[in-house]
């Protein structure tokens, strides 16, 4: 009975060691995955458009007005929240938005389909790396569109 918990502990420890060892991409055999990890995921430099998008986020956070939309948990009920609260709760975080920007910049996407934009900040991150992109953003709730 005592051997099983030790085996699980050793297994978790080895998985943790592998995660730490290969975190920066070293030890990954695939050149594609190595470049993706080192040049996209682990890159820390700030790009030119991040400042503009975060300035727009701050403007939306302090914007007056409320939006009434259907509640996800309680079917049939409606919620009323301020625009700032919706941006704070539902929009993409700056860290994840920067990752979206770096991914689209790395793959040089020309056509982008986004489902569920919620105020459009993630759409800005996806499309701000170049001009002349074709982006189709679908939003289920007309209040957020």
Predicted segments with their positions:
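A short alpha-helical cap/connector motif
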Residues: 1-145
